[in-house]
Each structure stands twice: as C-alpha cells, then as structure tokens.
Amino acid sequence: MRSVSPALACRFLRRRVKPRLTFAQTLTEAARAFALNFPYEAPEGGFRRQRLGGVPTETCGAGTPLLYLHGGAFFAGTPKSYRPIAAGFAAQGFQVFTPAYRLAPRHIFPAAFEDARAAFAALAEERGAVALAGDSAGAGLALGVMAARRRDGESLPGAAALFSPWTDLAVTGASARENEGRDPMFTRKMLKTASHAYLAGASPRDPRASPLYAELSGLPPLMIHVAEDELLRDDALRFVARARRAGVETTLRLWPRVPHCWQLAQGVMAEGLASLQEAAGFLRERAK
C-alpha cells in the first residue's frame, strides 16, 4: 500500500487545490477544484444504491447502521467522492449509508438539512439504533439534525462522530482569520462564498444551518476531531465548549499538521486511519 505523509498531502492541496478554490469565478469551478483533492483511493466494488426517505443513497458494508453525511461546503462532494471514508467505516464493522443530499446553488437552504433529516429518519425507522457521522458541512448537518430531532422529541443516534464540523456559517471563528495562511485548502473568502450560496439570504444563525447556535442539551455523546491549522478549528472548539456547558458528553481531539478532512486518506495515511478507527471505536462502544 502506498504511504502518504500529512506534509505531502498538505503540499499537494496548497499547490493544486487552494489556488483553484481561491480564484474560482463560479461555484462550478470551485466544485471542480474540490474534485482535484488528493487522489485517495477506495475500492470500486461493494457499493450499492438505494433511497432513504426519498434521498438517493449509496451503501456499503454490513453491521451496525451508520449514516455518513459527506462534506463539500454545501456545493460539492458526492457519495462516490467520499467512498474512502465509507469503506473505512465498513471495514470497522458498519453498514454505511451516504446520502446524496441536494447541493447549492441549485438547491438552497434548507434543502441539504431536509434531505439529511429525511435520510436519518428513514434509516432510524427501518433499523432502529443508528450511528451518525460526518465531516465539515456534513458534520454540521449531522449536528443540526440531532438538535432538531431532540427539540421535536424524536429518537437520536446512540452517538455521533464529527470530523472538522462546520458549525457557524456566519464564519465568526477567530481561526477563520488566524489560520488562513496555514490552512492548506481553504480561505475565509471561500467559506463566506459557500455560506452565501447555500443560505441565499437566510440567517447564518439559523440552528438548522449553524448548530453552534442550537439548543444542545440532551444530545448524545459526541466525538469531534479537528486539525489545529484549519480554518474550522474554532467552529469545533466553540461548539465543544457550548455542548459541554449544556451537559453533553463530548470528546475532542486536536490533530497537528494534517489537512482538512484527512480521514479521506485513511487508506494511505496513518493519521487518517487512526482518526477513523478512533471514531469507529467510539461509535461501536456506544451502540452496545
């Protein structure tokens, strides 16, 4: 198996992806830049298609049901592009369901949230106990769905694992400025552009879009992993602080010198595999 160091992945992203994201004139161009992400590999076989709550969904593996909400800043990403993570969780004993929720700018807020909520509701009704995970925008969706279901008295997952959650679409975290030169992939302007495209005039403090502003009491145990040098670091840190004040069991780990969503490299990067295995163990233990 090829081995990729975090430094090599960061260098690739800084040279090949970040400039294209920074200077993209349209979201279509930016989505193409996302597709240039470091060439992480996943097996082609073993992925099946179905629908969950009317949402096209890709599934793989067998075992504990896990709904995985992919990232992509609400305008990019597909279940196929996140197969490395799905395959990684499947190898840890989960049946992974990755919904293809609707994306901006064609589908604006709250389309992605509604799709994520519908997919979770359908899977929970079908399978009962369900684990939940996601990265970046998808991690934010996962948190928003849980907060909404708790508010409405609906069942919650036994636990959730979140990688670099985007919890504040108002982009007010200090790290969005402090880490702009260190983050190998994103700029603050790009986050704001993505936020505006998805929200289309809706409030960035709507808890369905930004779970940082949600009522958090009563949420299940959470594990959050985030990179020290990424723009979204403080989205994670501020959310964890609020969740703990609300009495939510929350495990946080800060990872040095890794790129955003390094778990995509779990097949070739030791740090990616370690993060994914920690998350899988956390979810598995609380699914008992």
Positions of predicted regions on the chain:
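Short beta-strand/loop motif that positions the catalytic acidic residue
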Residues: 224-226
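A glycine/proline-hinged amphipathic helix-loop "lid/cap" segment
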Residues: 1-59, 288
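Catalytic active-site module of serine/aspartate enzymes centered on a nucleophile-bearing elbow/loop
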Residues: 268-288
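Catalytic nucleophile-loop/oxyanion-hole region of alpha/beta-hydrolase
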Residues: 77-79, 85, 97-129, 266-272
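Short beta-strand immediately N-terminal to the catalytic nucleophile in serine-hydrolase-like folds
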Residues: 132-134, 163, 255
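Gly/Ala-rich beta-loop-alpha elbow adjacent to hydrolase catalytic centers
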Residues: 134, 138, 142
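Short beta-strand element of the alpha/beta-hydrolase
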Residues: 63-73
